[in-house]
Amino acid sequence: MAEISKDQVKHVAHLARLELDDEAVEKMSDELSAIIDFAEQLNELDTDSVEPTTHVLNLKNVMRKDEPKKWISQEDALRNAPDHKDGQIRVPSILE
């Protein structure tokens, strides 16, 4: 049985910016241990004859030609922009 310690739960909670009381830490420790035990059952499967896959479905990317098309003019594109300069839309800074 995989045992997830209370310290491990507290560490993960800290990384996730979660505040857990002692009761919640105890409960999460038990639940996470049970989840890992359940997942470890996959190690018992014989997968020697299973071909490795990267995707469950056999889908492939369907690409189209990259062809230039007639689009709206730069003037029309900037017409509804609240602020623009030198042909480009200006937006508020998000970095300090």
Swiss-Prot record:
**Any single GO BP term:** glutaminyl-tRNAGln biosynthesis via transamidation
Known PANTHER family for this protein?
Answer: GLUTAMYL-TRNA(GLN) AMIDOTRANSFERASE SUBUNIT C, MITOCHONDRIAL (PTHR15004:SF0)
Pfam families named among the record's database cross-references: GatC
Q: Which reaction does it catalyse?
A: L-glutamyl-tRNA(Gln) + L-glutamine + ATP + H2O = L-glutaminyl-tRNA(Gln) + L-glutamate + ADP + phosphate + H(+); L-aspartyl-tRNA(Asn) + L-glutamine + ATP + H2O = L-asparaginyl-tRNA(Asn) + L-glutamate + ADP + phosphate + 2 H(+)
Q: What does this protein do?
A: Allows the formation of correctly charged Asn-tRNA(Asn) or Gln-tRNA(Gln) through the transamidation of misacylated Asp-tRNA(Asn) or Glu-tRNA(Gln) in organisms which lack either or both of asparaginyl-tRNA or glutaminyl-tRNA synthetases. The reaction takes place in the presence of glutamine and ATP through an activated phospho-Asp-tRNA(Asn) or phospho-Glu-tRNA(Gln).
Family designation: Belongs to the GatC family.
HAMAP family given for it?
GatC
EC annotation?
A: 6.3.5.-
Q: How does it assemble?
A: Heterotrimer of A, B and C subunits.
Record flagged with keyword ATP-binding: yes
> Has the keyword Chloroplast been applied to this entry?
no
What protein is this chain from?
A: Aspartyl/glutamyl-tRNA(Asn/Gln) amidotransferase subunit C
Q: Name one GO molecular function term.
A: ATP binding
The broad enzyme category this protein falls into is ligase
What are the entry keywords? ATP-binding, Ligase, Nucleotide-binding, Protein biosynthesis
